[in-house]
Amino acid sequence: VADALTRADALCAARGTRLTALRRQVLELVWTGHRPRGAYAILDDLSQAGGRAAAPLTVYRALEFLVAQGLVHRIESLNAYIGCPAPGRTHTGQFMVCEGCGNAQEIDDPQVTAALAACATEHGFRVSRQTVEIGGLCPHCQETHPDPEPVS
């Protein structure tokens, strides 16, 4: 968590953007627990931490800023956010999302990116953003859950 905050401070300073106290606190909460966090869970944690009470819109604006800066990613299928381990480096969002525990892991596979770009080009489609979410079971949940339905 400390490394993520240090990288965020440096990245925002280099870009001339402000990592306000609230944005920093939201980023810290996203990284705490190392699993995707929803906006309302973050809001609850902010309320429990004391200090000023934040409105949902304020938390969403902080999350939008963090996403725009590449400090966090939004996991669409979970409607939650996860810290980016490589902020400042251009990459696409590729995630393995566990359907058992809800954990998510970011991967950055250039072959996946290239294959999707080639497919888009073949169909005359211009890509503006790319997010891939692969649902399944993490190694821990595979031990306790039956096999998921295979994708054909």
Regions found by a protein language model. Give the residues of each.
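Pre-recognition alpha-helix immediately N-terminal to the DNA-recognition helix
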Residues: 24-29
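Non-DNA-binding regulatory cores of transcription-related proteins
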Residues: 67-152
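Short, Lys/Arg-enriched N-terminal segment that forms or immediately precedes the first helix
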Residues: 2-16
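Basic amphipathic alpha-helical segments that dock to polyanions
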Residues: 59-69
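Short helix-capping/hinge SLiMs at alpha-helix to coil transitions
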Residues: 15-17, 31-34, 49-50
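DNA-recognition alpha helix
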Residues: 38-52
